[in-house]
Amino acid sequence: MPTINQLVRKGRASETTKSKSPALQDCPQRRGVCTRVYTTTPKKPNSALRKVAKVRLTNGFEVISYIGGEGHNLQEHSVVLIRGGRVKDLPGVRYHMVRGSLDTQGVKDRKQARSKYGAKRAKAAK
């Protein structure tokens, strides 16, 4: 334990927090190109085929990104926008695709939480 004098001379070193999405480099989103689009299976209690893509970002990082929503139009060489946010049951997936921007289409026939999936408002039926 330091003495008062030692604290006056040196002070306490503040702890630096480690980023949960280092590839974004403090940016809200990053652009990248899909190098591989595939499905993968989640961790133990869950079972599904989750859609993911390996993306090479403009800053040189290569990351795995989750494609949310039902159905997508992505393939190799698609230009996409990546945001932070991990997928709890997919190890190594720390980023999400932004739907409805660049080459990524929004989710079709989406009625609720549309802004999260890049879906336009449906025309009102008369």
UniProtKB/Swiss-Prot annotation:
PANTHER family: 30S RIBOSOMAL PROTEIN S12 FAMILY MEMBER
Stretches the record annotates as Disordered: 1-26, 101-126
Protein name in the entry: Small ribosomal subunit protein uS12
Compositionally biased intervals (Basic residues): 113-126
MF-aspect GO terms: rRNA binding; structural constituent of ribosome; tRNA binding
Keywords: Methylation, Ribonucleoprotein, Ribosomal protein, RNA-binding, rRNA-binding, tRNA-binding
Quaternary structure, from the entry: Part of the 30S ribosomal subunit. Contacts proteins S8 and S17. May interact with IF1 in the 30S initiation complex.
GO cellular component: small ribosomal subunit
Domain of life (superkingdom): Bacteria
Entry-linked Pfam families: Ribosom_S12_S23
Residue numbers bearing the 3-methylthioaspartic acid modification: D89
Classification of source organism: Bacteria, Pseudomonadati, Pseudomonadota, Betaproteobacteria, Burkholderiales
InterPro entries: NA-bd_OB-fold, Ribosomal_uS12, Ribosomal_uS12_bac
Family as reported in the entry's similarity comment: Belongs to the universal ribosomal protein uS12 family.
GO biological process per UniProt: translation
Biological role stated in the UniProt entry: With S4 and S5 plays an important role in translational accuracy.
